[in-house]
């Protein structure tokens, strides 16, 4: 581009220094004089003929391929200028125009621009080189055009030299918003930034993410594709392929590239949506070949061709699938429609395109409407000579309102806005100047006013933004077949500011919904409960769907990541679409195990009551008296009842009160029970003890009330400190995946262990004392049963420790309940059931005489054993005394002992036995 500019500059200097040249009138397409001249650049022909000269000479070649739609655009400019001239907007000032055909070539556009920049009213028509163009008066004051962005860029760089205003009606390349590189460029259409943003939004909203893109190899095509790629990525849309076609039809490779593009489309079977940034003649050739290959897709049309009648009228175009396009917002077209109906009365002597159209139309009048435009386009202008005196046939322009069907409303409205903007800017500039003079103002002055002008089209108000753009918005159009003909229908409007599509009625909303029925995805859609996992492809849209793991969920389609549930309060299974609240669990009253434990506790309480009744009714019997009396029995039975009742605090929803009560109630009541058993064990051991030393010690130790109060008091202190320093509290255990365990946190494991350990110490002492007195009379064998009871307690609680440590969940309290029940039942049964059995089933043995006889027999047996042990000791002493003087004579002593009379031993033992028996009998009788 820089080399081109140097070449142009040198070319302009040569023009200035060379001999004056002839005015190239044949290069001007349309002209009309005026006080203020406006230039126009339109691609009336689709291409320029290539030169066969070798070497090629610097000549402007003739153009072919008459474009009816662009011809209508030139008429729109003429009509808009005449509307201003016929209005009071510019009082006494007439706008003139010079319109040139660019032939879709930058070279022709630059040649026309050189003429625009040439000095006004100079016979030599040269561009004078100056360092300061502030007072330079060029041939025109402003330019409308060009249509294609690449041409506008080249022209704008030339116009920057004089800061001549250039207002484009169609160039949408985003780079043209850069006022540093293009300071004199303005446009009455939005930037491609908004169009590509709208396209990406439409694609995402329709549920597509795998699309193709086709563009031209020029500044417009490359910039549009890059901008769309950025917008697509932001909307999670991937471009499967990008095909680039030569920018000009004169390129010999264009047919090959079109075929390659179609082969790519066929190969990418999953791509059902294709975005097309092409010129009209590219799309025309592409679609004709696509119809031959029976390719049916959704085509996203850019504003370049979305309403082009030349393409809409392609035979069998409906076989291509759906075409959804973006076009500029339209305005009031009634005045222009009337202008077209009277076009035959318009003089054609200064309007070569009009005359050419009339001749081409006449030559193709035998062609039906569907092929008429193609016929006109295929005729070569090179075969025609213009006879401006020939009368234009009126009926040709009225044939089914032919020209009106080729009108592109969005572009026509943009041209009207461009002329209106210039008209209002000139009005503001000419308020204090005589604008009938050619040097009334310079182009750069008009540019300054134009940037800030506010104007109206009769309905809406407009002004250029800081980038020189007129953000009028877009219309979304859909090609639909109506009565056998393809028509363009408005589907929605796109609001640039809020990035939303605005539908006007239910029918258009239905059309939007129908688009979603077509799939264009690289991978199958991940349903809720799944997430996308990359497969190694460079495209993020290509993935595989994997299920969300446990405690994760996805509630939308095609989610990149599964969302995490709050593990403390919620959970989710594999492939979940939502989080579920964790169920709060605890050992409830209606639980089957809880019901069983409650029944056992109630049964235990019933047993306690039954024992209490039995003992109360048999209060004066020896069995009850030997048990310590009714007070001790009632205290123990009450403790057992409290132990059974304490299990109820382990069931049901945990509360602070129940958590604090259950352990302390059990601990204190069980300690009181064991303390009573301890006193009973001491009493039994004391009653049947024959060792004087042990008896003396036990008499000092045996203090029932202090023992019970002291032992129980220590446990009360332990529990009180526990409740004060680290009381049990309710805790939500959230470590399980699907439930919240509502449980009592004991507060202090040390305090809990101390409480249980203290009971164990007391139980062990009871066990020792009971074990010492286990060999009592058969009917008085309470110590043996107490030993069994303590063994049951130890076995239960030793088992409890590992089970409690390894059990988890709502049944953890049940473990302690079971242990409490086992130990409580064990002690209750071993302590009271044998006595109840004697009371109820062996009433004959529950008398004082039987008990006295039993005690007497046991005492006699015990004394006999004691006497025998004394005889043995005496014999041993005598033998020792005999042998001591002669240590070596031990055998003789033993032989002497053997010959002692048996009667002597028996007599000695009998005397001692009778004395001990009487004494022991008196002691046992007093206890009964």
From Swiss-Prot:
It is found in: Cell membrane. GO terms for biological process: adenylate cyclase-activating G protein-coupled receptor signaling pathway; calcium-mediated signaling; positive regulation of insulin secretion involved in cellular response to glucose stimulus; regulation of testosterone biosynthetic process; response to amino acid. Its main location: membrane. It comes from the Eukaryota. PROSITE patterns: G_PROTEIN_RECEP_F3_2, G_PROTEIN_RECEP_F3_4. It is a multi-pass membrane protein. This is G-protein coupled receptor family C group 6 member A. It comes from Rattus norvegicus.
């Amino acid at each position: 581009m820089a080399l081109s500019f140097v070449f142009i500059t040198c070319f302009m200097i040569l023009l200035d220094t060379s001999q004056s040249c002839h005015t190239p009138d044949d290069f001007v397409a349309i002209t009309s004089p005026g006080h203020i001249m406006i230039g126009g650049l339109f691609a009336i022909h689709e291409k320029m003929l290539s030169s066969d000269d070798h070497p090629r000479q610097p000549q402007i070649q003739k153009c072919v391929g008459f474009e009816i739609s662009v011809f209508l655009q030139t008429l729109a400019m003429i009509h808009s200028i005449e509307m201003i001239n016929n209005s009071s907007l510019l009082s006494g000032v007439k706008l003139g125009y010079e319109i040139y055909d660019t032939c879709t070539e930058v070279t022709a556009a630059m040649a026309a621009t050189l003429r625009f920049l040439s000095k006004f009213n100079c016979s030599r028509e040269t561009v004078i080189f100056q360092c300061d163009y502030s007072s330079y008066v060029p041939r025109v004051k402003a330019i409308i055009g060009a249509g294609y962005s690449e041409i506008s860029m080249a022209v704008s760089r030339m116009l920057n030299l004089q800061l001549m205003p250039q207002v484009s009606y169609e160039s949408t390349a985003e780079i043209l918003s850069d006022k540093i590189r293009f300071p004199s460029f303005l446009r009455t259409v939005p930037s491609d930034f908004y169009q590509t943003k709208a396209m990406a939004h439409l694609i995402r909203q329709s549920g597509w993410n795998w699309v193709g893109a086709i563009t031209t190899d020029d500044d417009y095509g490359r910039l549009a594709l890059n901008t769309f790629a950025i917008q697509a990525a932001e909307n999670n849309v991937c471009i499967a392929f990008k095909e680039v076609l030569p920018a000009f039809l004169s390129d010999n490779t264009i047919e090959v590239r079109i075929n390659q593009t179609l082969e790519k489309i066929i190969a990418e079977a999953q791509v059902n949506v294709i975005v097309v940034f092409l010129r009209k003649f590219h799309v025309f050739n592409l679609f004709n070949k696509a119809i031959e290959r029976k390719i049916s897709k959704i085509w996203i049309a850019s504003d370049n061709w979305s309403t082009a009648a030349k393409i809409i009228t392609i035979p069998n175009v409906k076989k291509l699938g759906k075409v959804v396009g973006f076009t500029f917002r339209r305005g009031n077209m009634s005045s222009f429609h009337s202008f077209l109906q009277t076009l035959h009365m318009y003089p054609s002597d200064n309007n070569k395109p009009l005359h050419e159209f009339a001749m081409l139309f006449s030559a193709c009048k035998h062609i039906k409407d569907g092929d008429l435009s193609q016929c006109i386009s295929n005729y070569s202008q090179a075969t025609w000579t213009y006879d401006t005196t020939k009368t234009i046939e009126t009926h040709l322009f009225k044939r089914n309102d032919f020209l009106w069907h080729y009108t592109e409303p969005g572009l026509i409205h943009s041209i009207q806005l461009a002329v209106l903007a210039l008209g209002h800017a000139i009005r503001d500039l000419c308020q204090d100047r005589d604008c009938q003079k050619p040097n009334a103002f310079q182009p750069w002055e008009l540019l300054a006013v134009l940037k800030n002008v506010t104007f109206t089209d009769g309905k809406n108000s407009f002004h250029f933004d800081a980038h020189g753009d007129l953000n009028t918005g877009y219309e979304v159009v859909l090609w639909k077949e109506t009565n056998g003909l393809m028509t363009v229908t408005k589907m929605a409007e796109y609001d640039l500011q809020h990035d939303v599509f605005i539908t006007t009625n239910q029918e258009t909303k239905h059309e939007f919904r129908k688009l979603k029925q077509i799939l264009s995805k690289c991978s199958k859609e991940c349903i809720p409960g799944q997430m996308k996992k990359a497969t190694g492809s460079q495209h993020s849209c290509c993935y595989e769907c994997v299920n969300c793991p446990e405690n994760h969920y996805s509630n939308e389609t095609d989610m990149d990541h599964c969302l995490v549930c709050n593990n403390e309060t919620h959970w989710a299974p594999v492939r979940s679409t939502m989080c579920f609240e964790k169920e709060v669990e605890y050992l409830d009253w209606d639980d089957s195990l809880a019901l069983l434990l409650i029944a056992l506790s109630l049964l235990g309480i019933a047993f306690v009551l039954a024992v209490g009744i039995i003992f109360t009714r048999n209060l004066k019997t020896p069995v009850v008296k030997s048990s310590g009396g009714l007070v001790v029995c009632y205290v123990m039975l009450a403790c057992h009842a409290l132990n059974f009742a304490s299990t109820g605090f382990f069931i049901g929803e945990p509360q602070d009160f129940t958590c604090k009560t259950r352990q302390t109630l059990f601990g204190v009541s069980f300690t009181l029970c064991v303390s009573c058993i301890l006193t009973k064990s001491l009493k039994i051991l004391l009653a049947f003890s024959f060792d004087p030393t042990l008896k003396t010690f036990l008499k000092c130790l045996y203090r029932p009330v202090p023992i019970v109060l002291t032992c129980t008091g220590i446990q009360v202190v332990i529990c009180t400190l526990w409740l004060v320093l680290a009381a049990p509290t309710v805790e939500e255990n959230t470590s399980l995946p699907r439930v919240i365990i509502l449980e009592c946190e004991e507060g202090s494991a040390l305090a809990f262990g101390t409480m249980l350990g203290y009971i164990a110490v007391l139980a062990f002492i009871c066990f020792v004392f009971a074990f010492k007195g286990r060999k009592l009379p058969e009917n008085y064998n309470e110590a043996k049963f107490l030993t069994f009871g303590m063994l049951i307690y130890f076995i239960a609680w030793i088992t409890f420790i590992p089970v409690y440590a390894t059990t988890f969940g709502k049944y953890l309290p049940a473990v302690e309940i079971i242990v409490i029940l086992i130990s409580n039942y064990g002690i209750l049964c071993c302590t009271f059931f044998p006595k109840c059995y004697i009371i109820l089933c062996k009433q004959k043995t529950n008398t004082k005489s039987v008990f006295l006889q039993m005690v007497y027999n046991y005492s006699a047996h015990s004394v006999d054993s004691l006497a025998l042990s004394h005889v043995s000791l005496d014999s041993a002493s005598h033998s020792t005394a005999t042998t001591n003087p002669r240590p070596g004579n031990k055998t003789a002593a033993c032989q002497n002992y053997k010959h002692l009379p048996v009667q002597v031993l028996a007599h000695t033992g009998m005397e001692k036995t009778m004395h001990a028996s009487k004494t022991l009998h008196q002691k046992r009788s007093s206890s009964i």
